[in-house]
Regions:
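Short loop/turn segments that flank or connect secondary-structure elements
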Residues: 1-161
Length: 161
């Protein structure tokens, strides 16, 4: 989904979007029931918990400096390929609730995109990605995260009257 703007090789080397600590566990992607079942079939120890109409992984208690790797992350990248959660397909973009308005933001952790001019990122969103994100969020409201002020807002949703 982001191959036009984000180099897949850079992503494969970085993997920061697949590793969580206690401060960013709220970023855990929302999995569909089908994807959760597929992952459980390869690793029955994964603890999925309901989250809206989907599921998130419960990593258990994480110590202050402890890291949790997504169980779908392998040596070769994500084992889910094209079936990865929507959150993962659009990362480092996020959809968040900013004072009752949905907004597309960007995670500062992705140095590949965060270092680019904001105008370039907004232009990319305006080529259809923003519309796809808002449409998906209409069908799957559980992917809308509460706003975190560390995430610059790139685009606010404009509701037609």
């Amino acid at each position: 989904m982001l191959k036009e703007i984000l180099d897949p090789e850079s992503c494969a080397k970085c993997r920061i979007c697949c590793v969580f600590d206690s401060s960013d566990i709220w970023e855990m992607p929302v999995f569909t029931s089908e994807t959760a079942e597929k992952m459980r079939s390869t690793n029955p120890e994964i603890n999925f918990v309901p989250y809206g109409n989907g599921f998130v992984i419960d990593p258990g208690e994480l110590g202050e400096s402890e890291l949790f790797n997504c169980p779908a992350l392998t040596e070769n990248g994500c084992m889910l390929g094209d079936e990865k959660p929507f959150d993962c397909r659009i990362w480092p973009f996020r959809i968040m609730n900013v004072g009752g308005i949905r907004a597309i933001t960007i995670a500062s952790l992705c140095s590949e995109l965060y270092s680019r001019p904001l105008s370039q990122l907004v232009d990319f969103l305006n080529k259809g990605l923003a519309e796809n994100i808002f449409r998906y969020a209409d069908e799957h409201p559980e992917i809308v995260k509460p706003y975190d002020d560390g995430y610059p807002v790139l685009k606010l949703e404009r509701k037609e009257k």
